[in-house]
């Protein structure tokens, strides 16, 4: 399926445009035959014309192709036009009651102090960090139901570097006299960060990782669809791809930080990943990229697993360790990344919907609406509704998990206490009768919550255990501990008829 079919381009309105119809594919293919400098120059001219015409549909397609939006001077304008077409925000409207200070601001400051480590100039580094804190804080205060997560600052850093690149790299300004905020279009920058956060990152900005883990499971499902042999070798049905959490939460910004001097090729790779994600309006795309990154290294990962199988006690550690070892070595392999992105461009639009259907996603996930790969425009009332429902669902998940852990903890404590009265070995039937008694206790406590019941249960259990506590009893020869535990317990609290 050609990519342009996703964008529903009105071909009749562009009959004279050289980039329409089949011209898109032919044009992008011709660029691949040019040397990189000439290709960047040619594509840059095309993007400039599309920006002049505000041709968002064409920009979407161009952004998916090789070189993305070419350079940050063009990229910042392309990102703004695309994100502004995806989300309508009225600055005069207060969608959620803001707060004066968000609970996560302390962590934001700590993470900002570790950011932009590759920037040599101290004044510039200080200004970048200050800007990072200001932008993140502004988002959090405006939408206080969002929760900051470690990694969000990496994503915001990408937008900052994109918008400030010309100021710090090309204009030759004296850095000691530089006022970054005066040189950057701050309102456009904030709009991009705000829109990207609300459209693409909602799943990650809850106060638990449940929705984030749901997205990781999509990677397993995509691998199952693409390479069943590797899926079985890694045992993805048993081992969740938790190793991918850092890459997905930051859309690879943590792996390929744009903070060193010069516009090197790895920075271009990172910016192209964002170009593709925004152009396709899809948070599925980073998951597909990660899947392709794994499969391109499947052979080496398999060898690593085989070579180290004797050194790990469990499959989970073995397989996760193998993947981390291989990917860490390949992290700065430019040729590998180029190959992965090219494969992704070909299969991003054909990745089967079955891969998503096999994963239980919350129904308000960005993967299913605002960043599902189908370009569309959303109003803020819809976004606030999604955010509100996801927040409620997240709290429900947490509550269920808490009660589940609490119940398991109470059961474990009860069994441990019983163990103090019993030798380590005893008759099998004694064991079964005692277990049945415990189950009956839990059932009765769940259905009847009266103090008298608790006291009666306490008396009954203590009596049973007292009978077993005499040191001369040999439990190997005891035929039973509790003859009829269900009858004894369930009749408690019920009047005799």
Curated annotation (Swiss-Prot):
Pfam families: RabGAP-TBC (PF00566). Residues 69-281 form the Rab-GAP TBC domain. Keywords: GTPase activation. GO terms for cellular component: cytoplasm; endoplasmic reticulum membrane; peroxisome. SUPFAM superfamilies: Ypt/Rab-GAP domain of gyp1p (SSF47923). One of its GO terms (molecular function) is GTPase activator activity. InterPro entries: Rab-GAP-TBC_dom, Rab-GAP_TBC_sf, TBC20/Gyp8-like. This is GTPase-activating protein GYP8. One of its GO terms (biological process) is endoplasmic reticulum to Golgi vesicle-mediated transport. Present with 573 molecules/cell in log phase SD medium. Signal peptide: none annotated.
